[in-house]
Amino acid sequence: MPKSQIVEPTKERQAGIIPFGEVPLNQYQSDVAGEKKTYGEEALLGIYEDMLLIREFESMLQSIKTQGSYEGIEYDHKGPAHLSIGQEASAVGQAFLLDVDDHILGSHRSHGEILAKGMSAIRKLDDDSLLSIMKDFLGGDCFRVVEKDGGSDVKQLARDFLLYGALAEIFGRENGFNRGLGGSMHAFFPPFGILPNNAIVGGSADIATGAALFKKVNRKSGLVISNIGDASMGCGPTWEAMNFASMRQFHELWEESMRGGLPIIFNFMNNFYGMGGQTAGETMAFDYLARVGAGVNPQSMHAERVDGYNPLAVADAIRRKRELIKKGEGPILLETITYRFSGHSPSDASSYRIKEEIEAWQSFDPINSYARELSDAGILNEQAIASRKSEVVAAMTKAFGLASDLEVSPRLPSEKIAGLMFSSRKRESYDPDRKPELLLAHEENPRAQALAKKSRAGVIDGKPVSKNKVFQYRDAIFEAALHRFETDPTMVAYGEENRDWGGAFACYRGLTESLPYHRLFNSPISEAAIVGTACGYALEGGRVLVELMYCDFMGRAGDEIFNQLAKWQSMSACILEMPVTLRVSVGSKYGAQHSQDWCALVNHIPGLKVVFPSTPYDAKGMLNTALAGSDPVIFFESQRLYDIGELFEKEVPAEYYEVPFGPPAQRRVGKDITLITVGATMYRALEAADILEQKYGVTCDVFDCRSISPLDYDPLIASVQKTGKVLLSSDACERGSVLHDIGSKISQLAFDDLDAPPVVVGSRNWITPCAEVESDFFPQPSWIIDAIHDRILPLPGHSLTTNPTTGELIKRQRGGV
């Protein structure tokens, strides 16, 4: 919402025609002979060798999957293998001119890209650097295996290291590049510029965009390539990523020194099929995929179709597009046409295409075609071809023998996986040697000045401080965010209304004055891209604070939260960190699509930390904890609470402090019943506790589960052992809620101490109704008291106002409500 950009009605209503530029198709006209002077014979020969290496690697996997052996060595590989036989030229041509600082992210079919980029890096790095990388990576576990039988040639040793590390990873071995936790579809090796490959179609698009954002914001060298297939053009996150990468603010609103597009190439490896569907002609609208660029920005993303069966054509395209990126003219769209001779996977019989089509493409086999060009240019002869093929088979047999041997390459003990779900590292700054870029000193920030005049105590002389004078929950969010911005120069924040507007519910009001555009900006209303780019930014080594305005919007970012944010730390064996805090606001009064509490969804997903603070003190302390850690945190906030003051602690300190994840907060001490709450329901539970004590003489332990995962059960169990009775309540729908999970564990851990089963009082299993009747949907104090009376402890003289009976519960479940 920049006031500098005026939307003029006269201009916007003018008649006219939108022009579209031409999209080049397969324009490269040179050959090996023509490029001999440019690249030299050795480099041109290296292209051939790398293509041979990839072909043999993939053929080996094909043989293992279909015949159970390779070169006489038997092996049963139970995992997946999505092969790129036939696509070698596109991978090698792309990697040919890339530097180590250029990063690639791929798909489920990226073995070839891993090897191509790895070999490119090996050729560009000096021997000392290579030895240092190999010896240091994973404590040298992978290197020691290949070093035993390796020679003195460091480049050859590095090649063996690359082959073994990748293959051991595919086979799920502890010496693999990711400890065997990534496997075939997720293998990667950051020291060579190979970032995670992704099993989700199109999954690398927004992650790569975030990686490019990191490079731009932090002024890092190199570009980023998202290698995704033609089928990914049918995925919403791919479109969101291209739009995000093309935002005009990069050129028009960011500071002068930061202007220019993101350094990213969206490279669509177009092999013409997505599973069993043919893209152009059947499942997509385009004829040429490159045409899509015209719909994204006025430059048509500099889109181009490139002949991916000619490695030199691909290398030429990368060279030209790199120059555009250096000029700040990214993003780029490349359609690299190629063809897979094998099926989608070894079990695919290719019943959706005819034999003649496959044979037609095989007649243009890129390896054979390129070998002929090398021969015609006097660089390679038949004897040399045979020799190189023999060398590749020998290297592959050696790597396969080592990777398939359980004594040499054991599997990671399963019990160690638990220790790799989180990195759990304290990171005050991800670039401690750099000063954060700020527009104002802390004491000059207008909101910080205003907060200095507010009461940090919510209660004075037994009376609550008025809303306009008290330090509120939203102020706690602001202070924690500003502190980390002033500490960590890599930290950025973005979302749908972060700049100028002041963030959702005014939590960021005052940040715009302190932060340059590249550290705080508005994103498109693209929840998948918001979370996906945050993942990529974090994987590159930066801290991100992003928000979804309403919890209900998490569905738009389901894959990015459940499969990307949650899993990359553990799939990398914590080589990578994921310092992303995702703020999620839980609404009320806004109906069925804006008033849901989905804590249970993310609590179910391994790899996420989930918190839901309900007081200003906890909000600031827990956000400080999240923003000083290395793990992904889903940070729930209730819209009911943004304007409340601190009612439990003496005050909210102005100084920095942290509230640890895990322990629940005890808000009330009693002896008769344990009440456990999540979120804003805690305040209604306290109302119920007051009524129970005043009217019935029943006192309650009241716990606030501000940390959902992790959760320390010891205080809860100690309370239940004292009271023998427990009721749990939150604003989430009752069915499948976090409360049932907590209640179930309490039953297991304190069964002998319970006088009655744990009782859950959640919201009704309906859609959220209009604001006027929300009291019939969300838990109320009377609901809690009725449930206690009917199912836990009869209260003398109490009359039910609701129907909390088990019979009613059975009836509702029978009806699905």
Language-model region placement:
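Conserved acidic/glycine
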Residues: 1-90, 131-132, 142, 341-515, ...
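Short coil/turn connectors at secondary-structure junctions
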Residues: 44, 48, 77-78, 99-103, ...
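Acidic-glycine-rich active-site phosphate/pyrophosphate-binding loop
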Residues: 60-61, 172-188, 218-219, 290-291, ...
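Cofactor-binding active-site loop characterized by glycine-rich and histidine/acidic residues
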Residues: 63, 67, 72-264, 274-300, ...
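Thiamine diphosphate
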Residues: 89, 192-410, 492, 510, 577-578, 639-817, ...
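Phosphate/diphosphate-binding glycine-rich loops and adjacent basic-rich segments that engage nucleotide
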Residues: 590-676
